[in-house]
C-alpha cells in the first residue's frame, strides 16, 4: 500500500507530467530511453518509499537483496521491467535523503537512463542521422539508451563486460527499414570518446561470436535468419546493421560531420 500511495501522490500533484517529455529527435514521440527513464523515476520513487516503510514498520519482512537477485536472475525482457524498481530505487536513494524530498527528483528528473545508471547530469550528445532509402522505407527511428544496450549485451556477455561496454554511451539512433515483408535496422551509436567506442566494438565482437558465425564482412545468426555487420563510422561512432541479409550487406554510412551521418540503402 505504501508503494501505491506514492503513485497516488505522483499523479494527484502532477509530478509524473514533469518526468514525461517527448524527444523531437525521434519524430516528436517519446523515445524508448526516455520512457524507461520515466518508469525508473516513478517506480523507483515508490519502491524507495516502500523499502523505507518496511524497514521502519515491518523490519522482519525486509529483504533488501530480493530485487537485486530477481534482476540478476531474470531474462533480458524481465530485466527491462524489474530495472524500474531495482535500479530506479537505487537512483532515488542517491538523490534524496527522505520521502519528504521526493518532489525534487520529479521536478528535476533525469533525461536519460544513462543519468539514472550513473547518478549523473551528463547531457545526451548531439547526433543527427539522415537516410537515403532507395526502394526501402524508413519506417521508424528511436533512441534505445544505455540501459537497453547494457541489458541486450548481457544476453551473451558477463555482467562486468556488458556494463563496461555500454558505459560511455553518448547517444544512439536505431532506424528500422522495411521493404515488402523484409525488415532491417541501422543502429548508430555515438560514444563519449574513442576509448569507449573501441571497448564497445571489442565487446560486441564477442557478443556476435557467441550467437552468430562470421562469413566475410558479416555475421550470420546461428539459430535464426538475422545478419549483422559492424562499421566504424568515426573513432567515436559505431554503426550496427542488422536484419535482412541483402540490406545488411549493401547499406553504407557516410559521415557528413563528426556527429552527422547519412545511411544509404541500395534499391
What is each model feature region?
Residues 6, 15-29, 33, 37, ...:
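Long, terminal "pre-/pro-" and other extracytoplasmic accessory regions
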Residues 4, 37, 41-52, 83, ...:
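Extracytoplasmic/secreted proteins, especially bacterial periplasmic and envelope-associated proteins
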Residues 1, 28-39, 75-82, 185-192:
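Second-shell loop/turn segments in exported
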Residues 13-63:
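Post-HExxH zinc-binding segment in Zn-dependent metallohydrolases
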Residues 50, 54, 61-74, 81-84, ...:
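Alpha/beta-hydrolase
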Residues 1-9:
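Short alpha-helix carrying the canonical HExxH Zn2+-binding catalytic motif
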Residues 75-188:
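Pan-zinc metallopeptidase signature
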Residues 181-267:
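C-terminal soluble interaction/assembly domains
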